[in-house]
Amino acid sequence: MSRTRRKKRKGRVRPLRLLLVVFVLTGLLAGALWLLYQTLDEKTVIELDAGHDQTQPGYVSDTLREADLDMEIVLGVRDKFAENSDYVIQLTHDELTDMNMTSRLEKIDKDNPDLTISIHTYEDPYLRKTGTLIVVPPSGSRKSISAAEKICASLQEAGRGCEVVRMAYEAGREGRSTVRYLTLEEDYPSGAESREIFSVDSAVMEIQLLNMNDTGDAEQWTDPAFKASVIDAIAKGILSIAE
């Protein structure tokens, strides 16, 4: 009789032990997933965008296209973070994919990164200087403004001029918006006309990087050392954001 009772008890105990093991394993798995989520959540997600599509890329010099230079700078900045596990670097498009501005802005809105840096090399006809526009959405975010200031400080330290400007939208038809460039305190230099671009419903902040060359000599972008200094300064500015 006693043996039969023991067998029955054993039969009851085994399912309880199994449930206990399942409960413990579930708890451990949940803890591991939470730690993984926390680790990913702590990473800074940065989206790099090479401006200008291939339909109207423009030229920085007689032989250097803006679209090619933009991509070269973007890839250079990305490579700086190849072994840095604190950052997740995404691209709106690569050198094999061509996307217009509207599509790229829509992707940025969908990805919702912590910071977006969009490179637009150009020669400003009003300021008679060559430089780069870095677009950091969303405008009004304290984090975006702080990031802009730190990247500018890094570029100024490297001897590159930098000015933070805000883009003011005026709603237009058929998905177009007229844009006025504004500094944080006053209007963009007099004489600069409003510029029209495609846009989506996202606020944008721009950093205008000027090389302080009053002659507007765009040929310096063909100098590998000059391009490397700009890439290094942008990367250094990004790293300083977390400090």
Show which residues each predicted segment covers.
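N-terminal Lys/Arg-rich, disordered targeting/topogenic segments
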Residues: 1-16
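Conserved hydrophobic/aromatic pocket- or pore-lining residues that grip, position, or stack substrates
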Residues: 48, 70, 234
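Short glycine-rich His-centered loop
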Residues: 43-63
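Short domain-boundary/entry signatures in modular proteins, especially
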Residues: 37-43
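An acidic helix/loop motif centered on a single conserved Asp/Glu
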Residues: 60-82
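Active-site-proximal helix/loop segments of hydrolytic enzymes
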Residues: 17, 31-37, 74-243
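Core hydrophobic alpha-helical transmembrane segments of single-pass membrane proteins
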Residues: 22-30
